[in-house]
Amino acid sequence: MHKYSYATHVTAVVICAAMAQAQDGPPTGDAANGERIYLADGCALCHGTVGQGGRGTGPHLAPNPLPFEAFAGHVRRPPNAMPPYTAVVLSDAELADIYAYLLAIPPLPDPKAAAILDN
């Protein structure tokens, strides 16, 4: 009985460790390089220069982008008219850089808080 109990315990620890590693979050990217790629590869044409959306057909990407896995899935296999950015076109490292850039974009100020609107 102790053998099974010990084996079960070890198996549970290994599974939990693997699950925790899988949920570590997005890969680390270079936000400055991500901004360069975002602007150079045409993302801004539809999604706006700071990911705000509202230009053309692209939805907002920042602040608060999708979780990385969902974001990567949309970029690689878009469910809409966006062209797919396969790993041949955009490497995994470049995709992580773009995501890091989107995470680094601060929220836009609330337009209702602008003093000029009070006049």
What are these regions (language model features)?
Residues A31-I37, G48-P84, V88:
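Gly/Gly-Pro-rich "capping" loops immediately C-terminal to redox-active cysteine motifs
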Residues Q23-A32, R36, A40-D41, T49, ...:
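Flexible coil segments in periplasmic/lumen-exposed cytochrome c-class electron-transfer proteins
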Residues C16, G53, A62, R76, ...:
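Hydrophobic alpha-helical segments
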Residues L45:
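Short, cysteine/histidine-rich loop/knuckle motifs that typically chelate Zn2+
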Residues M1-T28, A113-N119:
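N-terminal export/targeting leaders of redox proteins
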